[in-house]
């Protein structure tokens, strides 16, 4: 599959091609920094990829984060090595992809909320069962993007540098995205925190659309 992914990247314009997989040191920083800087990076898995256009930060200090309850079997990955995936199922239905951040022993992660499809779009359509849908509908939410990329719970704790889920550095076309900062959505606790980061004006972000000034 790595060969197929490399072949797909070669078909892109030079300024669309993502950089190298992000090193663990990228993630070993405060979660708010990582959440902002992941916007514009590229997620690859199983023959498809997309540019991250929306993220949310979660930290053990606030009650919307799974790590708020402390170390349990479920939350153990959140306290582990930065740069690994934390994948869980929401409401028993949708897989959610997160990148573990901060120092080992600190429970923090970035939820990948939306992607702009880059390669493997027809695979995404088939996986979503949406043959005629607009591209902007394919990955405009965390459950949608996991389904489009065929990410399931068996990817929990995978190394995001080595794969099979890989996050790569921003393509040149995304070197300096304009970022909107707004409140997190879809949660009932600590929803007032401005920990949602999205690419300004991008059609692929999730609903409700962020309403904030660039910062």
PLM segments and residue spans:
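Conserved, well-structured core segments that form or line functional sites
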Residues: 2-215
């Amino acid at each position: 599959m790595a060969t197929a992914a490399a072949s797909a990247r070669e078909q892109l314009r030079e300024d669309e091609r993502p950089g190298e997989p992000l090193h663990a040191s990228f993630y070993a920083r405060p979660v708010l920094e990582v959440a902002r800087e992941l916007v514009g990076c590229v997620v690859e898995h199983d023959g498809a990829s997309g540019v991250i256009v929306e993220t949310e930060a979660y930290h053990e200090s606030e009650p919307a984060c799974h790590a708020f309850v402390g170390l349990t079997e479920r939350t153990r990955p959140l306290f582990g090595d930065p740069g690994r995936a934390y994948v869980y199922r929401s409401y028993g239905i949708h897989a959610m992809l997160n990148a573990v951040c901060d120092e080992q022993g600190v429970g923090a992660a970035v939820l990948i909320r939306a992607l702009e499809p880059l390669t493997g779009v027809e695979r995404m359509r088939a996986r979503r069962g949406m043959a005629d849908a607009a591209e902007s509908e394919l990955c405009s939410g965390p459950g949608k993007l996991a389904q489009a990329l065929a990410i399931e719970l068996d990817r929990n704790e995978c190394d995001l540098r080595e794969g099979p889920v890989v996050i790569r550095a921003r393509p040149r076309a995304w070197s300096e995205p304009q970022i909107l900062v707004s409140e997190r959505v879809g949660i009932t606790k600590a929803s007032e925190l401005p920990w949602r980061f999205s690419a300004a004006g991008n059609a692929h972000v999730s609903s409700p659309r962020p309403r904030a000034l660039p910062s």
